[in-house]
Amino acid sequence: MKALLSLLTAVAVATATPLDLSLRALPNAPDGYTPAKVSCPATRPSIRGAGSLSPNETSWLEIRRKNTVQPMTDLLGRLNLGFDAAGYIDRVSSNASNLPNIAIAVSGGGYRALTNGAGAIKAFDSRTQGSTQSGHLGGLLQSATYVSGLSGGGWLVGSVYLNNFTTIADLQSGDHGNVWQFSTSILEGPKAKHLQFLSTADYWKDLLKAVDGKSDAGFNTSLTDYWGRALSYQFINDRTGNGGLSYTWSSIALTDPFRRGEMPLPILVADGRNPGELLIGSNSTVYEFNPWEFGSFDPSIFGFAPLEYLGSRFDNGQLPRGEPCVRGFDNAGFVMGTSSSLFNQFILRLNKTDLPDLAKDVFSKILTAIGRDGDDIAVYGPNPFYGYRNSTAAYSRSRELDVVDGGEDGQNIPLHPLIQPVRHVDVIFAVDSSADGPYSWPNGSALVATYERSLNSSGIGNGTVFPAVPDVNTFVNLGLNTRPTFFGCDPANLSAPAPLVVYLPNAPYSTHSNTSTFQLAYSDSERDEIITNGYNVVTRGNATVDKSWPSCVGCAILQRSMYRTNTSMPAVCNSCFKEYCWNGTVDSKTPRTYEPTLLLGSTSTNAAYTQGVTWLVGILAVGVAMGMTA
């Protein structure tokens, strides 16, 4: 393991010019990256059942739902619905369960997902200049209760929240140190203004030192630890200059703005992998990280651990007397890295890339070796669910819990936390930046995976209901992969309450935003062009593609609420639902290759499907060093 990291260090040094590191900014870990023993609270931490929301989330929701009333009133009032939206929200606001309950989900897909998703968040944020003008959707973020992300979408969610719920514009501007400076690869390290590191070699030594500290304290580590530390340098604005070393995911819950309910609840998603498995199936356990807890609603676990005390040695849901409490395990970078442990996924997607055959062969051999040694996962040990409920499941008998990228089960949009009945979500704005086809555009596979899982005969869906969606061929043949589509428009057709899903697939409005998941370096202009394109995706070019789109967004927001309150929908919603709701039509013949053209005028040179050269050179060099190219 350390030999492999040393090789990566050597490769990075050999292919990079000397670099600097700048400063970044919730650190509350007791000993930096190393989890440490601390005094237990008077009520010792324990695992709780997943039959309800946590007391923390329940009490927070009482505050947050009230805080969405005014932003929602303002937003709906701007969307040309032709009825008294403010009056309706005022009438139902006395009972929060009748208010529209909005969620936003941002898919995985590396930096492509980060930047395209950032465009969506920027469009939904009323703080973005111009976002509350006619044709725009600013205020949807302020009206939302939940925001979920996985993999690259998780980096986006994490970076926004760990930098004090900052704006996308601020992250682009450089006002937060050197976060979001992607012109150099994560393998090389960030550019430095404050010269903490003089070179890439120093950067890698720092990563190694931090992870060694965790290992020396008795915790098993994997490649995800190094990956997470590297991500922190790109996404956390730590003013001490040490790359978010002491930042924890649970510390989000301690910030005053979050406690006041001034922002949605952030959730990251990851998948479980049983001991001895390499590939992740559709019935794998789906875990979530929210600011208070780590766990799963799936029947395999059906429990949640207090996130702040991960690393403590729980047994059958309790922390035995004599066992110390541990804090600092939920390092923010490690959590983001867990949700984006792409190493296994790279093997699955290699043949869909334009990498040379030699590179594919080398890459496959390296990653297979990593997977065989168990280094491609995030190790959560001690396993907080060891012996929990006296379960016979494989996870319960393992002292460690293996967790991987949240999209490896095919559910590349983090819908799982949002379709749980106890959360009562009404509408999900699902931003899909998946690379499903040969040119890295989405084709609805992520929605299909979630729908099929809800029907799985194994019972893994555990009572969740998801609207019907067509097969992926139909998505492409009907053009549902090119424009927004609503699923679940008529709640009367559902077997139980479920959200309306507004599907927002990545498409080329102003630039070709289908960059490769393998691309690890972006110029500022390329980054910004894809963010602008993402803004255009969710606003339909600020309603220039369809002037009725903002009204239709309002209809999607209101539909479930008005159904519950037996209120007639605005007349404009009839035409909106006719235009955007999937009507059940299926066309499953093999589609032609999807090669779209720009929907709006180009803002840049073509940014289509490119590989990260530094990554490729690094992999080949490692392969040569390991004797894998013979």
From Swiss-Prot:
Glycans are attached at residues 56, 95, 164, 220, 283, 351, 390, 443, 456, 462, 493, 514, 542, 566, 583. Residues 1-16 form the signal peptide. One of its GO terms (biological process) is glycerophospholipid catabolic process. Its main location: membrane. It is an enzyme of class 3 (hydrolase). It is found in: Cell membrane. Residues 39-587 form the PLA2c domain. SMART domains: PLAc. GO terms for cellular component: cytosol; endoplasmic reticulum; plasma membrane; side of membrane. It catalyses: a 1-acyl-sn-glycero-3-phosphocholine + H2O = sn-glycerol 3-phosphocholine + a fatty acid + H(+). Belongs to the lysophospholipase family. This is Lysophospholipase 3.
